[in-house]
């Protein structure tokens, strides 16, 4: 069977639907998976980097539109399944610290958040590998509880266990 060129080169636009949940908190939907952006005094935290780089570049673009002039400093990752880690390298490349459970650390270091090129569908890290690490941490691993706080807003992140889905 020969795949027609139009089918092989088809692109599918990524659409991000934004819903304000509270002052400075947005649901970024429009696909099978969602992200949440939380505005702090001098940075943004995003929860979840699902699917693939294209989806996450669209989410990042929407966050920049919503909150210009504040960096995305943190990406909170809920678990290690492929549909939840597709954009982790994208956030790593823009200098965000990845917050995840400590059980994910070895897998992410070995297979995901490294500078090895992705050859089937090259991402930003593959195409433009950094010459040096971004300022700040690459990871924050948590065991039970973690707080992001800047004095005016606090976000509490908890490890909910036991959930066999994410173990």
PLM regions: where:
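Short, exposed beta-strand/loop patches in secreted or surface proteins that constitute
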Residues: 14-20, 37, 145-148
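Conserved beta-strand hairpin/beta-sheet module of binuclear metal-dependent hydrolase folds
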Residues: 19-65, 158, 167
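Active-site metal-binding motif and surrounding structural segment of the metallo-beta-lactamase
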Residues: 43, 54-99
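Divalent metal-coordination and catalytic microenvironments
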Residues: 24, 38, 48, 79, ...
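Catalytic metal-binding/acid-base residues of hydrolase active sites
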Residues: 50, 81, 104
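Metallo-beta-lactamase
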Residues: 94, 102-166
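Accessory recognition modules or surfaces
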Residues: 51-56, 70-71, 75-76, 108-119
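Non-transmembrane domains of secretory- and envelope-associated proteins
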Residues: 1-19
């Amino acid at each position: 069977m020969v795949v027609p060129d139009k089918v092989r080169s088809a692109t599918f636009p990524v659409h991000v639907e934004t819903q304000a949940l509270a002052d400075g908190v947005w649901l970024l939907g429009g696909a099978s998976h969602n992200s949440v952006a939380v505005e702090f005094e001098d940075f943004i935290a995003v929860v979840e980097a699902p699917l693939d780089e294209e989806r996450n570049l669209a989410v990042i673009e929407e966050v920049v539109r919503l909150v210009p002039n504040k960096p995305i400093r943190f990406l909170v990752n809920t678990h290690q399944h492929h549909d939840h880690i597709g954009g982790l390298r994208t956030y790593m490349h823009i200098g965000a610290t990845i917050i995840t459970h400590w059980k994910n650390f070895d897998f992410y270091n070995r297979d995901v958040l490294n500078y090895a090129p992705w050859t089937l569908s090259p991402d930003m890290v593959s195409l433009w590998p950094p010459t040096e690490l971004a300022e700040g941490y690459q990871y924050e691993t948590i065991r039970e509880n973690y707080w992001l706080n800047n004095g005016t807003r606090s976000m509490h992140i908890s490890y909910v266990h036991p959930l066999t889905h994410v173990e």
